Amino acid sequence: MNYQEQDPEVWAAISKEQARQQHNIELIASENIVSKGVRAAQGSVLTNKYSEGYPGHRFYGGNEYIDQVETLAIERAKKLFGAEYANVQPHSGSQANAAAYMALIQPGDRVMGMSLDAGGHLTHGSSVNFSGKLYDFQGYGLDPETAELNYDAILAQAQDFQPKLIVAGASAYSRLIDFKKFREIADQVGALLMVDMAHIAGLVAAGLHPNPVPYADVVTTTTHKTLRGPRGGMILAKEKYGKKINSAVFPGNQGGPLDHVIAGKAIALGEDLQPEFKVYAQHIIDNAKAMAKVFNDSDLVRVISGGTDNHLMTIDVTKSGLNGRQVQDLLDTVYITVNKEAIPNETLGAFKTSGIRLGTPAITTRGFDEADATKVAELILQALQAPTDQANLDDVKQQAMALTAKHPIDVD
């Protein structure tokens, strides 16, 4: 009996998900498609091993080869970003952030981070998240005119609030972030600087976005998204913070690391070091800009900040007569996957929202070019122009399926 026959219910769901990924245009900005090597590593025998501790200092025996894999991941991460120190054990970006906070500050300390409706992440101080419960966070927003970061306003806020830590980075901000300015702001108020580059890490690695490593005390990231690796987290830092971060990850936040995932991280980081990754990253940005141009030329939607410098954009869909959740559900019926997203000064709440977020990493991995990306944006607008016309929606779905058929995912 093979494994599919052993548990047909689970494998039926996996098979359906594989089909969904094959025929859907994936525009969720945090998703991507990993290589066969990354997938194979995660399904390898490394999942059988327990390895609490760090290379050369484990609490279990038999970790000679686990040490080799983790050391490769560490060294590749340091080389890719020019970092003095790397920890590749965090299970997720959220756990990387939790460990960074634990290493740098104490519960109750003041912290500034981007507010959720401005494009920040839950772990940047949301009241429903551990970060907002354990630490005294104050959110900073965007310039009301440009919907971009206003560094003078952030400085004034920091001078008034006097945080011990400033967090830069976002999960839905489409413009370049000036980490040098954030460093200057932190220095002026005597704060530490942490950067969460989870979304833009691949663009940073490719030299297409400013690198926060020279400026930040600590940098956290996920290893998926634009890095195109397995689901997981990673921390980069100045060497002087290494011991504190190691202790904050293990035993502070986690027990045994996921060795099979760390192997996937090592493989992905090796891929990211290759010249062709830079070409891929540039295509991500080109595709995003092509989509933003289509939306900017339409009266039906509004691109927050007027465009994008990276892999994503937030679209205000209010003029369409639908909210973000309705647009997300509508597009799902025509095989285009997006997520609802709050816009600056959101009034509808997190479960409806006034916007959607779009990203191009996954479609770029599939081979979509600027013409394809332009077509995808046009299909979204076509669906929004007549959201109750089934013939119109059927036409959009057929065109979406034609695009994915032209660029299939290699899953064999």
Curated annotation (Swiss-Prot):
This is Serine hydroxymethyltransferase. The gene is glyA. Belongs to the SHMT family. It catalyses: (6R)-5,10-methylene-5,6,7,8-tetrahydrofolate + glycine + H2O = (6S)-5,6,7,8-tetrahydrofolate + L-serine. GO terms for cellular component: cytosol. It holds the Pfam family SHMT. Its main location: cytoplasm. Keywords: Amino-acid biosynthesis, Cytoplasm, One-carbon metabolism, Pyridoxal phosphate, Transferase. It is found in: Cytoplasm. It comes from the Bacteria. One of its GO terms (biological process) is glycine biosynthetic process from serine. It comes from Lactiplantibacillus plantarum (strain ATCC BAA-793 / NCIMB 8826 / WCFS1) (Lactobacillus plantarum). Gene3D superfamilies: Aspartate Aminotransferase, domain 1 (3.90.1150.10), Type I PLP-dependent aspartate aminotransferase-like (Major domain) (3.40.640.10). The keyword Transferase applies. The modification N6-(pyridoxal phosphate)lysine is found at K225. Homodimer. Its cofactor is pyridoxal 5'-phosphate.
